Amino acid sequence: SALVYRGMDIGSAKPTSAELQTAPHHLIDIRAINEPYSAADFVADASRLVREIRARGRLPLIVGGTMLYAKAIREGIDEMPSTSPEVRSAVAAEGAAKGWPAMHAELAKIDPAAAERLAPNDKQRIGRALEVFRMTGKPLSHFHRKAPHPAFPMLTAALVPEDRAALHERIEERFDAMLAAGLLDEVRQLMAEPGFDANSPAMRAVGYRQAVQFFGRPHELCGISFGRHRRYASAR
């Protein structure tokens, strides 16, 4: 999902200009970093593009994507309320002050079903659930009860690495290459843009979030971000 944001090139492994010339891509560089882009936005955009590409007699390929986006495009998505930068920032500030286990306990009082699914330190999903409740007065699980509708039929394929040690070695090499290519300079430029918000959805991307958080402590960045990449790859 980070591919949609302009300026997030190195950390998202965005296709190069030469690659884009060779194989047409869509939904690249369509948002500024301070503009939200949700799974619902992705389903709407991808569905439209699939129809347009098939109308031209071509076969669309949907490549990559987080688990949320992949599930949304395969199965459809619940109709969720839109995000609010103001409420999201307020929840993030409260979580930083109280600690996310305390926020998880608050969520358990208003939405036990959602809290049961989430770890006490899953600040992104806890924050989103609290944001939804504060905006609508309804728990997040209320919206999940609505049956989703598949977006369109599709064939799903995946590559599953057999050797986890080799995978971790490749992840470490990839992250080192990103640093060598100028990831920190890229993040510094993003932080200098007007309206930059460290709590925006764009800055939740693995690597970017850690670079912003630990920008003043570069000696910690490599180990922390590499660990995040490993856990993210394992989950995917």
Task: Name the predicted role of every residue range.
Residues 1-236:
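Phosphate/pyrophosphate-binding catalytic cores of soluble transferases and nucleic-acid-acting enzymes
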